[in-house]
Amino acid sequence: MAQTIVKDPNILGGEPVFRGTRVPFKVLIEYLEGGDTLDQFLEQYPSVNRELAIAAIEEAKVSLVSKLR
């Protein structure tokens, strides 16, 4: 599975972003924390498609769970 969240020092100073975009992954988390829906996020950031957003959430979940073990 290709990484959906990438870090590149040439893109936003290495901030984790959605692959192929300049949209920081943390923006999605902030939307969800604030009570917004995935659809609201996607409307504001059309360069991120639904499949990419869901895959990134899954990737982050797997990473977090593995760190907790």
Per-region residue spans from a language model:
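Long, charge-rich, low-complexity alpha-helical segments
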Residues: F25-V27, L32-R69
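A short, structured beta-strand/loop element
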Residues: M1-D36
